[in-house]
Amino acid sequence: MDKETQMMLVPQGSIEGYIRAANEYPMLTAEEEKELAERLYYHEDLDAAKKLILSHLRFVIHVARGYSGYGLPQADLIQEGNIGLMKAVKRFNPEVGVRLVSFAVHWIKAEIHEYVLRNWRIVKVATTKAQRKLFFNLRKTKQRLGWFNENEVDMVANELGVSKEDVIEMESRMSGADVGFDLPTDDAETETYSPALYLEDKSSNFAAELENENFESQATEQLGAALQSLDARSQDIIKARWLDDNKATLHDLAAKYNVSAERIRQLETNALKKLKSAVNF
């Protein structure tokens, strides 16, 4: 992978600058995309893979915005989505008859969703116990029931001890319908735009409401004690990445400690594992 692609897969500096740079890569026509996909699929052409990836970065950004309400760093959401995009490009079969973005959106969302599930508890220790219970139980409940009707909303609310409004809000957040992400055809009679071009977070106020909740004393004490058990550098990384209002990027901390961004990620991952094993909520 060349330096340009590596830099665009890991947002650095201001997120606004990254988005501007991503939007400068032109979108592909169906014919251009098919040609590049065939070169990659049949001949393992890495230059074709690069062009496919860079031309779809803007779609990752739009999908990542749909998860902004959880308070996680936008740069990290985008980076996780980019991992999903790379996996999709690698597996894309140009003979299937769909556009790459329709195939890739599922991989992009899967990577971001798993990232949210891995990290949301530590970030949102201030939320109510009922909200945490809902977040981590709703997915398995939905696997059993599918999309909820009114009676099922009542049942889930009673089962998890939360309000019906919370169930509906969380279901909307976690299970938004996947609509077509293809670009309009050239012969479209009216000027329309792909949902991927205007997809945005429809319920970002959800996290803002949660942030106004009072800390539960037990969870706060547990987290405080767990943080104190970490070494000074790990404490600083967790606070800077997850607890401060102005969250630092991996590259910010890499520069501070004169190590690579990957090393900071490793330290962060190890620290989060220790916190999760120490905090019971």
From Swiss-Prot:
Keywords: Cytoplasm, DNA-binding, Sigma factor, Stress response, Transcription, Transcription regulation. A motif (Interaction with polymerase core subunit RpoC) lies at residues 76-79. Sigma factors are initiation factors that promote the attachment of RNA polymerase to specific initiation sites and are then released. This sigma factor is involved in regulation of expression of heat shock genes. It holds the Pfam family Sigma70_r1_2. It comes from the Bacteria. Residues 250-269 bind DNA. GO terms for molecular function: DNA binding; sigma factor activity. InterPro entries: RNA_pol_sigma-70_dom (IPR014284), RNA_pol_sigma70 (IPR000943), RNA_pol_sigma70_r1_2 (IPR009042), RNA_pol_sigma70_r2 (IPR007627), RNA_pol_sigma70_r4 (IPR007630), RNA_pol_sigma_r2 (IPR013325), RNA_pol_sigma_r3/r4-like (IPR013324), RNA_pol_sigma_RpoH_proteobac (IPR012759). Residues 52-121 are annotated as: Sigma-70 factor domain-2. The keyword Cytoplasm applies. PANTHER family: RNA POLYMERASE SIGMA FACTOR RPOH (PTHR30376:SF3), SIGMA FACTOR RPOH HEAT SHOCK RELATED (PTHR30376). It comes from Haemophilus influenzae (strain ATCC 51907 / DSM 11121 / KW20 / Rd). Residues 226-277 are annotated as: Sigma-70 factor domain-4. GO terms for cellular component: cytoplasm. The keyword DNA-binding applies. Belongs to the sigma-70 factor family. RpoH subfamily. Interacts with the RNA polymerase core enzyme. It is found in: Cytoplasm. This is RNA polymerase sigma factor RpoH. One of its GO terms (biological process) is response to heat. HAMAP family: Sigma70_RpoH.
